[in-house]
């Protein structure tokens, strides 16, 4: 009986090690996306604000690619009923992986002015300390031109 239990425990251990803990990633134009993420190209309307509504959970949901012009000042805001939804903004024109903005609780708005024409990747993220099945959260991202 002890031998059977040891074999069963060893089998479970091997099976758990072979399953990846996070989603696989793929590179799209120099930006890493999780397999569950869809890249969606968006653009500012001729007048008014750009509003992006969606749902996200760890490694799943839409991420947005926005073309921005040099010298154009934009205010980007995130709203969600969940305190665990944050937003990261990356610049496709910069080779490093650092976000040019990463929101946190109480700081979900930024004002950015690019020095050159570029594209931003806007990624809403649901941050949970432990994975839970089926959990996700709705969000609204608003991009406004500033004077």
What feature does the model see in each segment?
Residues 16-18, 80:
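Short linear Ser/Thr-Pro motifs
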Residues 1-9:
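Bacterial N-terminal signal peptides that target proteins for export
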Residues 46, 105-106, 137:
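Exposed loop/turn and edge beta-strand positions of beta-sandwich/beta-sheet ligand-binding modules
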Residues 24-42, 64, 120-147:
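C-terminal edge strands of extracellular/lumenal beta-sandwich accessory domains
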Residues 8-16:
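Bacterial N-terminal signal peptides
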Residues 19-23:
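Sec/Tat signal peptide C-region and signal peptidase I cleavage site
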Residues 40-53:
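N-terminal beta-hairpin/loop module of FHA
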Residues 55-127:
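Acidic, Ser/Thr/Pro-rich low-complexity intrinsically disordered segments
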